[in-house]
Amino acid sequence: MQSILQLSDAHLSPRNTLFRGNVELIRRAVSDRAPDLVLATGDLSLDGADREADLQLAAEWHRGFPGRLLALPGNHDIGSDVRLMPTQPVDDARLARWQRHLGPGRGVIDLPGWRVIGLNSEVMATGHAEETVQADFIRESLAGLGDRRIALFLHRPAYLFTPDEAYGPWAIGPEGRNALAPILQHPALRLVASGHIHLHHEMRRGQVAHVWAPALSFYCDPSDQAGLPGGRRPGALLHRLHEDHVETILLAPEGMEAVRINDIQDQTYPRS
């Protein structure tokens, strides 16, 4: 059976040693049986959007896992839509910096019976040229699908609860959702896996599992995520690809440290 290891929101930086212990514990947990694919769903770095050294270190640590790596950027890696990151919008320099260390930020990989599609959620609704390029890529990603099932990965969830919900900071906005429609509405879709929220949660819509990966780093104060379901325990996910569905297993080895962002604010994202 094919398997995909999903790593998300490690927020690594050479300016501190935060979260490295959690990443190392997951690496050890999978060292005896390498996954067929390692999918990093964004925010690999603490501030790669402005600091190349953060991206460089994050790339090194994520490449330390056994298996092929497909890395997708998060808002702290390349910036995002100005509504989410008003001082760090996606631009050519930020995209180029990511690509130097971690590749194109999207990809299609075929595994037996499955097509894995990874997308850059942070260019959606930005107006950047890369948004148009990716829209074409989305359509092309379905060519030659045959009887394969689809597993979609990206940093931000396609939506939190319903496909018609309004814009909010925790998911892709309606404009981006429109670009995703060819995949989200495809009858072969079985998994939409994301990060960003620092919560572990799974819901089903028909045959599709929508899974939020836990963060490898910190959790948010519950008061800042009112109404959002899920567990705050750090970890990673192992997706096992069956013939017509995905079995998702939480990896949370003993010793992983759960840290509230408020308690390390000065070492991560100091408030101005």
Residue ranges and their predicted role:
Residues 1-57, 61:
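N-terminal active-site segment of His-dependent metallophosphoesterases
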Residues 13-16, 46-50, 75-83, 124-127, ...:
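Active-site environment of divalent metal-dependent phosphoester hydrolases
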Residues 28-38, 115-117, 127-211, 246, ...:
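His/acidic metal-ligating clusters that form di-metal
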